[in-house]
């Protein structure tokens, strides 16, 4: 999703997809990604299934220092948080941004450069299992979702975010509004 496809892959995708009776996608806008590859009548929407996790309401309480988190992977071209981290550098107030992130090269190099600048305001954590993560997110004041910079892909983590029972702030570089973020910081 974060790089341009080679021209010949479209032919291979079309050939592979021709062998299926149906193609299922998790939400309607994802059908656009298959335009020209398969007839619209072959593409059906089947929402993702989930196992619900019960969260103890006692976990959900305000932190002394506004604390928020993101859990997932970053992509240089469709889910790049540099604009947000640059914004955080301008803040002259206490906060703690906890990031549970895969240890890929792009994410680690980018986050380590901001860690040097933000210090203890940025906590970088390795991925943990889904249920533990939902419990950790429940301890935050709110959670951050970086929307993809495209319309045909949507992060499945929003389901887990909702189970954490914490407010969700979603944005990308075009939709980020500092005044909305400040309102979340203030509770």
Question: Model-flagged regions — what are they?
Answer:
Residues 21, 137-152:
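Acidic donor-binding loop of glycosyltransferase active sites
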Residues 65, 101-103, 108-132:
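Nucleotide-activated donor-binding/catalytic signature segment of Leloir-type glycosyltransferases, i.e.
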């Amino acid at each position: 999703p974060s790089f341009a496809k080679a021209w010949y892959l479209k032919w291979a995708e079309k050939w592979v997809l021709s062998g299926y009776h149906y193609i299922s996608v998790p939400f309607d806008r994802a059908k656009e990604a298959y335009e020209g590859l398969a007839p619209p009548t072959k593409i059906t929407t089947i929402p993702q299934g989930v196992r619900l996790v019960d969260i103890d309401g006692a976990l959900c309480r305000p932190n002394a220092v506004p604390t928020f988190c993101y859990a997932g992977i970053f992509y240089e071209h469709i889910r790049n948080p540099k604009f947000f981290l640059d914004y955080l550098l301008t803040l002259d107030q206490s906060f703690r941004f906890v990031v549970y992130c895969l240890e890929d090269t792009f994410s680690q190099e980018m986050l380590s450069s901001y860690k040097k600048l933000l210090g203890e305001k940025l906590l970088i954590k390795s991925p943990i299992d889904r249920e533990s993560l939902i419990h950790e997110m429940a301890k935050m004041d709110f959670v951050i979702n970086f929307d993809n910079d495209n319309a045909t892909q949507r992060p499945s983590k929003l389901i887990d975010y909702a189970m954490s029972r914490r407010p969700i702030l979603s944005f990308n570089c075009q939709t980020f509004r500092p005044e909305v973020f400040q309102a979340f910081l203030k509770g």
